[in-house]
Amino acid sequence: MKIPILIMCIMVLLGINNDDIRYSDKKETNTLFQEDFEKATLDEVFQNWSNRKNTKGMSFSQDVPNGSRGKKSLMMTYVAGKDEGAHLFKSFPEGHEKLYARFYVKFLTSRSPIHHLVKLGGYQPAAPYPLGLAGLKPNGEDFLMSGIELPDNKNWSWGFYTYWMHMMGSPKKYWGNVFLPETEKSIPLGEWICVEFMIKLNDPVHSFNGEQAFWINGKKILHLGMGFPKIQHSGGYFKESSSGIPFKGFQWRKNKKLKLTLFWLNYYMTKGVEGEVDQILFDDIVISNQYIGPLKK
């Protein structure tokens, strides 16, 4: 009995509690980053991230996904005409060739259109905060970005919104290109959804063997790579189609120095009726070099 008591005394002296052990930030193999929002305060949560926006619009919720080992999730709140939602940003300055991001999300309301959601990407050089690059075409050396989003807010369904060196656009402005699965995956309100997506960089850099894919509740919905799937596209709008032509693949970069350096938990809102409130929940975030999958129930 003396050894357990001694261990507990050491934990108290070091300021460690049971939650810190149970909810370790790196408890899975190949896990680079983990966030379960189980800290005592939001300020402690923010220490796990590189950058944040609108902390007043964030709060804890007692609503958690089925299978979660925790008791709290993060709520982000948008007030139309007052703010632009909120975000948490994590930088990985060491850079990676492939990243998987899994998170749980619950849309509580749908009053205002969602401008942007969660993203993976890379800056060269890496930055500890989001850079203002909207409307710019990457040159293969400076940046790449892809978000798992709602590209068509009138029809709530999942898709990619992607910036890369061969994206389509006008000579003056390049907005993210949209990638959709052949069968739309609709997004329900008031339900926890397990979302996972990945980016694999092209190697060698002159090749088009880069990829991206996403899964909803553990089911792969769309996977894009060199020669697959068949795609129909018009301008910057790409849709999986059995009657299309094989997708060329992604040349994400032409310089090996450009790597994946960021995860952006984004709830970016810009429209809506002034004063109306929208809210979203996030929980159980994991960033890894390999597929993660849903929580075990």
Model-derived segments and spans:
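Short, aromatic/His-centered strand-loop micro-motif at the edge of beta-sheets
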Residues: 166-196, 201-205
